[in-house]
């Protein structure tokens, strides 16, 4: 009797769960905005006719990615950037890369010197050296060719993980303007700029250099030079100071360095918006964990990220878009003492259990945009407001062993303003220049 009762309870529970899933899928089928394809050069026609009000009224758009090495994420983000340029007046493109990338890229996309086959060498992040991203830079260049300078697209880096060459900018400015500065301070700037971060061990050398860099900044601030180059060199010094501070924290108790990096990215975005954007609008290209409006990693972590700072400061003027996927091919970095470390391509053939993707694979659209504000207001069986699993794929790519380490809990309505779901993903095109 007890066995029959347990079977009955299990069947009833299964019936209820299936009913809830059917209700959720029906709501998503009826309310999600279809994205026609992942072609970055085609128009977002359906989205344009159904643009969520919060999206239309926003000024700063954070577009994430569930991994740093997925063709569809890159192409769809490029597609949305072009849409925002054409329809909402966005001209500022900010990337999860270093400040040093700006000069070469901006010269090329504004019609100046450069080579399409080498333009991506300006990036510090290996992941951006793909045909998909170079094609986007080419589109920016073509767009800018017949535009006055004040209406051209400009590229900016917000990250602080590299100090290389910043010292050269500082020395050039000081020599050109004949500013009297202690040579020892300039040598400190040289050392900090040229020294790479060793993430494996603590080095207190970095923290002793910070007050010296601040002193150098004060000496430049006290000069009588206040032109455009002055503003640029102060910005360079701020990046170098931030890099040095970050380097001093990499072996601190978690999550100090993680939060510091995102705080500095927020400060850099804020500076760019306030000083370089004529209409206060900007597009941010980064990982989901940086641009989401709540926190890093699992729900409840309280690790404050870039997107949380942006949402707290800009309120509804900041719009966060996350990405998720179901199946497909993706790269992962393998540490192998025998064969040597290498990248491996994995084929995810079905969505994982207890994930948002498991349910989203049942909808009638291959790619869609979900307005999460609408999901909150109109139901969807509260699917997006319930905690569910999500695959976290960071800089090391897909690492399925052990799987539980990359399965994190999220509540999507708390995490993003909008969600883009892609049923099947593939690898971007690396080594394209050959």
Region spans (language model):
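Bacterial Sec-dependent N-terminal signal peptides
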Residues: 1-24
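Structured catalytic-domain cores with a bias toward divalent-metal coordination
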Residues: 20-434
């Amino acid at each position: 009797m007890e066995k029959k009762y347990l079977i009955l309870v299990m069947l009833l529970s299964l019936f209820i769960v299936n009913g809830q899933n059917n209700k959720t899928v029906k709501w998503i089928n009826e309310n999600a905005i279809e994205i026609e394809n992942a072609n970055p050069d085609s128009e977002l026609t359906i989205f344009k006719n159904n643009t969520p009000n919060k999206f239309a009224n926003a000024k700063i758009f954070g577009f994430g990615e569930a991994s740093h090495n997925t063709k569809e994420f890159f192409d769809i983000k490029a597609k949305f950037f072009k849409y925002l340029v054409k329809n909402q007046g966005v001209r500022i493109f900010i990337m999860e890369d270093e400040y040093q990338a700006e000069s070469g890229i901006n010269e090329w996309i504004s019609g100046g010197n450069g080579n399409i086959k080498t333009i991506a060498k300006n990036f510090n992040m290996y992941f951006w050296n793909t045909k998909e991203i170079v094609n986007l830079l080419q589109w920016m260049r073509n767009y800018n060719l017949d535009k006055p300078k004040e209406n051209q697209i400009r590229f900016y880096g917000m990250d602080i993980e590299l100090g290389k060459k910043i010292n050269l900018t500082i020395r050039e400015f000081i020599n050109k303007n004949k500013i009297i500065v202690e040579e020892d301070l300039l040598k400190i700037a040289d050392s900090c700029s040229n020294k790479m971060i060793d993430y494996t061990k603590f080095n207190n050398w970095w923290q002793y250099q910070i007050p010296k860099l601040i002193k150098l900044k004060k000496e430049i601030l006290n000069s009588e030079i206040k032109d455009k180059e002055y503003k640029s060199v102060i910005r360079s010094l701020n990046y170098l100071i931030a890099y040095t501070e970050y380097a001093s924290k990499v072996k601190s108790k978690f999550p100090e360095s993680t939060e510091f990096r995102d705080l500095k990215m927020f400060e850099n975005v804020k500076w760019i918006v306030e000083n370089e954007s004529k209409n206060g609008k900007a597009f941010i290209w980064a990982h989901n964990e940086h641009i989401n409006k709540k926190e890093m990693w699992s729900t409840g972590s309280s690790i404050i990220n870039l997107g949380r700072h942006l949402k707290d400061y800009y309120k509804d003027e900041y719009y966060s878009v996350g990405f998720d996927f179901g199946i497909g091919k993706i790269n992962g970095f393998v540490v192998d003492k025998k064969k040597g470390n290498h990248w491996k391509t994995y084929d995810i053939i079905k969505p994982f259990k207890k994930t948002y993707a498991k349910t989203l694979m049942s909808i009638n659209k291959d790619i869609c945009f979900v307005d999460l504000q609408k999901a909150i207001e109109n139901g969807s069986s509260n699917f997006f407001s319930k905690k569910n699993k999500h695959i976290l794929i960071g800089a090391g790519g897909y690492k399925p062993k052990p799987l539980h380490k990359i399965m994190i809990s999220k509540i999507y309505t708390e995490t993003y303003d909008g969600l883009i779901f892609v049923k099947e993903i593939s690898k971007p095109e690396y080594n394209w220049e050959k």
